[in-house]
Amino acid sequence: MGLIYAEIELINGGDIELVRRGFMDKDEIKRMWVTALVDTGSYMLAINENIQEQLQLPVVEKRKAQLATGQIIECDVVAPVELRFKNRQTTCRAMVLPGDAEVLLGAIPLEDMDVLIHPLRQELIVNPEHPYFAQMKMK
């Protein structure tokens, strides 16, 4: 299987809450579309410093991360990030990789959105068994 990319929308989850509470107008929500590498070997969503800056996502902690090269680096973790793909969405934390690193869409947000990798078409798809809404087991 080759590399699989997906167009996803990233939104500042704090802005969504400010709109809900009436402190911000809906058109002020910081959001952007990005192309993410679908990476089932990564646990979390990983964004880069440029995206963090544009969305003004607050740092909630620091964590160590092991890169594909084996190198261990310390990264900021930002939250909340709302992530949208087709008719699916999830709210999650994101690791911030240095510079203009590639966005990685990891296993946890993939599972939460109930999306799958289609190996023949080499694309991310909505789970055909649950096409209208995400479904997960609670046992």
PLM regions with names:
Residues 1-139:
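Pepsin/retropepsin-fold aspartyl endopeptidases
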